């Protein structure tokens, strides 16, 4: 997904401002999902905020792209993924692009 520089900065700022503690560590389970604790954390955050940042563990058995795809699929088409670097990505509401 192409995101303008302005929107990218806004999404990153939203996720950073809302972090309040540690970034959840994404623990992949197989190729299709993540620990319930990580998803529950994200659901709780998304009830209040519009962006949640995730960080891949170095030992994760799946690729960064596959992990981001799984997270996005878990939340549906109203959300998109913004890749920050090779370990971090942000799940955000598509409405932030408008």
Kindly give the residue locations of the regions a language model identified:
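Positively charged, polar, low-complexity stretches
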Residues: 1-98
């Amino acid at each position: 997904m192409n995101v303008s520089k302005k929107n990218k900065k806004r999404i990153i700022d939203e996720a950073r401002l809302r972090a309040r503690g540690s970034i959840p560590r994404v623990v992949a389970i197989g190729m299709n999902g993540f620990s319930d604790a990580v998803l529950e954390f994200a659901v709780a955050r998304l009830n209040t905020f519009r962006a949640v940042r995730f960080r891949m563990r170095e030992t994760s058995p799946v690729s960064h792209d596959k992990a981001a795809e799984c997270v996005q699929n878990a939340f549906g088409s109203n959300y998109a993924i913004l890749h920050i670097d090779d370990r971090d990505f942000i799940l955000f509401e598509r409405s932030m692009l408008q």
